[in-house]
Design a protein with these regions (language model features):
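N-terminal beta1-alpha1 ligand-phosphate binding loop
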Residues: 1-10, 14
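Active-site-adjacent pocket-lining segments in enzyme domains
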Residues: 3, 17-26, 44-46, 50-175
Length: 175
């Protein structure tokens, strides 16, 4: 609970347009999750009842409440680190890149996040750009950059052609 709705819903929408299998995950014991501004989403699965062995991507939306909860979830942090160490993809936007910084995932990488969180990107060079993609990690600055961030995820998973097709569908400039 406490996720940034624009970031979460934009990512969900764009990935589904690209026909990427996506599971919305509740970190709590109920499938209903409430965002920072009172918008409720229905999660597909509960984190505590799901195995992540076959997942290609961990995507962390921002939001002050959800990021605080994620910081305190040692099981999730272990799963994220294991996922990263296996060469699978990790994406974080807004406040949540700070979690990647804490885990050492951003070491010697360019990264971005909300400007107020730039000092939490341990080991990274903060760029302040809308998105940064390095190796198997993508970071996003914040809600206003959610479309670019989601298109970046599509490009990583499905390639530039699919990302361009989704961008054109949304009347985004492709270049």
């Amino acid at each position: 609970n406490g996720f940034e709705e624009i970031e979460a819903v934009t990512i969900i929408d764009i990935l589904r347009r690209a026909k990427i299998d996506l599971k919305i995950v509740s970190m709590g014991e109920e499938r209903a999750v409430i965002g920072e501004h009172g918008i409720t989403l229905m999660a597909d699965v509960l984190y505590s009842k799901t195995k992540w062995d076959n997942s290609e991507f961990f995507i962390l939306p921002g939001g002050i409440g959800s990021t605080k909860d994620l910081f305190m979830n040692d099981s999730l942090k272990m799963d994220i680190l294991e996922h990263y160490n296996q060469g699978r993809y990790i994406a974080a936007i807004g406040e949540s890149p700070a979690i990647l910084g804490e885990l050492g995932i951003l070491n010697e990488k360019n990264a971005t996040a909300l400007p107020a969180y730039m000092n939490f990107l341990q080991g990274a060079t903060y760029t302040g750009l809308p998105i940064e993609i390095q190796d198997n990690v993508i970071t996003g600055r914040g809600a206003a950059d959610s479309l670019k961030f989601a298109i970046g995820i599509v490009s990583m998973l499905k390639g530039k052609d699919v990302a361009d097709d989704v961008s054109k569908e949304l009347l985004l400039i492709v270049g």
